[in-house]
Structure formats: C-alpha cells, structure tokens
Amino acid sequence: MEGFRFLFQARNLCKLGLVFMLASSGAAFAQAKSKQSEVYMYEGADREQRLLEGARKEGMVSIYTSLNLKDSAPITEAFEKKYGIKVSLWRAGGEKVVQRALTEARAGRFTPDVFESDGIEIEILAREKMLAEFKSPVFKELPAEAFPPHRQYVVDRFNFFTIAYNTNLVKPDEVPNSYEDLLQPRWLGKVGIEAGDSDWFGSVVKAMGEKEGLAYFRKLADTRPQVRTGHTLISELVAAGEIPIAATVYNHAVERLTKNGAPIKWKALPPTFGRPGAVAVARNAPHPHAAVLFADFMLSREGQELIKQRNRVPSSKAVDSPLNKFPYRMIDPAIVLDESEKWENLWTDLFLKGKKQAKPSE
C-alpha cells in the first residue's frame, strides 16, 4: 500500500461499530484463544513434527496478504511443494485486507489462518484482537526490531526509504551524502517525493529532533519538490530521466531497475528508515497448525531467501542481502497509527496543499 492513506478510513471503520461488534464476539474469541494458543505457544522438542502432522490433518492454510502475487506466489508454491499443504491465497490492497477481515469477523466467519501485509495494517488487526502471539525457533535469527512489544506479529521484510538518482544526470560528486544536501540550489524543483510518505516524514523529524526536523522540512518544501503518487512510479521517472533525483523511494524497486540496465542507483542517507511488512497468525485460525507452520516457513532462511530472490529486503540476519548493509531504524506501526493525524496534517500543509511545482532549471 502506498503511504498509509487509509488510516482515517480505518478509524472510521471502528467508529461505525466494527470494534463493538468484534467485542461482542468475546465468547468466540475466548474459545479460540484456548484452542489455538496451545498450538501457537508450544515449544517442545517434537514441535515441528506435531505442527506437520496437525497441518496435514487440517489439509490447508488460508492466507490474506497485500504482497503482490509475483512476489507472494513463489513463496506459497514453495511451501506447498515442501509440506504438501494446500495454500488458499487471497491478495488485495492492505486496506481491503483489513476491511475483509473485520467484516468477516463481525459476521462470525473466521476464514484466514495467516495475515501478511504492511506493518500498519497488521497493527490494526492486532488492536482489533484478530491476532495471537506464537513461538518459533527461527526467532533467534531475527533482529530485535522484528518484534513489537505485544509480540502478535513478526516483521518478515522491510521497504527501505533511500534516495535514487539518474546516473546520466547526476554526477558522482553531486550525489547527496545527507538530507541537508538536498537543499542545495542545484536541486530546486528537481527532487521527487512520494505523496503519501507522512510516516517517513514523522520518523525523520523525530530522529532529527522535532524543532530541527520541522525546520529542515520547511526548507525542503521551499525547494518545491515534485510530488508524485507511487514509489514504483517515482523510481521509473528517475530511471527515465524525467526526475533526476528522488528523496523517498524503496531501494528494492531501484535495484530491480538497475538489474534491467536502467541508469539509476540508490543511496541510504542517515537516518535511514524501513517501513516493515509482517506476518501474523489469526487468533481464530481454523487451521492453527498450518498457520504456524507457514509463519515458520516465511521467517525461516528458506522463506527469507525467497523474499531476497524477489529483490525485496528480508528481515532475517541469517540471509545476506545487499539492500540492508547500512544502519537503519524501523518505522514503528503503533506510533504511526497513534500519531497519524499530526504528521499527516503537517505533511499535507508542507507538500500537498496548494503547492505549485517548480519547473526544473536548465
């Protein structure tokens, strides 16, 4: 999902009564908790054997994801081949994943076993009591940033915000080494930013110190950057030379273009932030053994290698990736959700409201 644009819609869903309706299903949740938790929290020596035997009896696993099919299908196909467990995969945008899950729960239908989506959507599901904690031996291979305090989901991939530049238009000695370098006169009207990146904005401001951070972004707004919708689009515009440099792209998207011969490179500027994607097991999963087995697979070296093969950034420390070899911090989905209105309003005032884009200088 681009830029968490449905945060206010998610709040509206709650106001319309979905939370109340979910709460009214407390008996179903309590029953599910005692049934599923035994599977989710088991750590005995025969754990893998018990999961596999239970999953084969269950016969399938149902997954709701926002990860696009060209990236998610190879993972589910590998899981089916390894374990012989049928996967039912439903893919949609992150907003629709949340809406469908909440709507089904309101009606007393609990279809998904596993959710895999951007961190903010998974955090919303956690707050709606849709998820449950689980244990896994692969956790030791993951960074501390992969676990929220409530531990009801686990980060399995990152989208790292970096700059990107066209190598035909930007000389090596012109490539910025800091965010301050983007304020140089040569970049007037030439810097691209994605329209929905208020979560990145808020994270960078807080890292700089709110007073200093807001002062910096006011200066950046004065350079009249070119605002576009879609990180993939911005990367493609940089590669095509329509925008010489962009401040908020995903480095894995740039890497794909580079491998295809496009004149584009990325660079991480400190502080570098990653927008997390996460995997979670459903509190009311109809196939709990298969749910944990798939979550294990997604977070294992095998699953993380498959994420890497799709030019995405795996969270595992056990999988080497050229896309995370720099100091980074994770954008906290809980903070984004709690503070979204503040940062969305500031972002809109600075970069979206009544702004005229400058024509790039020659």
Specify the residue positions occupied by each region the protein language model found:
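Extracytoplasmic ligand-binding site segments that recognize negatively charged/polar headgroups
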Residues: 62-76, 88-243
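Periplasmic-binding protein-like
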Residues: 141-144, 158-160, 187-196, 217-221, 225-228, 298-319, ...
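Short amphipathic alpha-helical coupling segments at ligand-binding clamshell hinges
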Residues: 75, 212, 216-219, 286-298, ...
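A bilobed periplasmic-binding-protein/Venus flytrap-type ligand-binding module shared by bacterial periplasmic
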Residues: 162-169, 205-207, 275-290, 306
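A ligand-binding cleft/hinge motif common to bilobed small-molecule-binding domains
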Residues: 121-124, 244-263
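Extracellular/periplasmic bilobal clamshell ligand-binding domains
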Residues: 321-362
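Short, polar/charged alpha-helical segment
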Residues: 45-56, 60-62, 66-86, 163, ...
